[in-house]
Amino acid sequence: ANAKYYHDALHDALTGLANRSLLYDRLELLLERGKRHPETFAVLYLDLDGFKRVNDLFGHSVGDKLLVGVAERLKTCVRPTDTIARLGGDEFAVLLD
């Protein structure tokens, strides 16, 4: 039961992606690790243009399906060591490690 609560606290309920809190935790670990062993990493920020219009025209259920679709597509584009997070609304971040 505790593992489920822990997972739920660190993941977005809609997409299953990491949430902002987990992204920040992993970024902090990378920065700390970088002090000892300099490495290269990147943070990508993505915002879906026109997403509000999708919700307004087609409803939130369609908007939710779009967000889930974007999440699934992003998962196919990164390595297992990378972190994809939904920051909220239509904002995503990818931590390339």
Indicate where each model-derived feature is located.
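Conserved long alpha-helical elements within nucleotide-processing catalytic cores of c-di-GMP signaling
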Residues: 6-10, 16-43, 49-79, 85-94
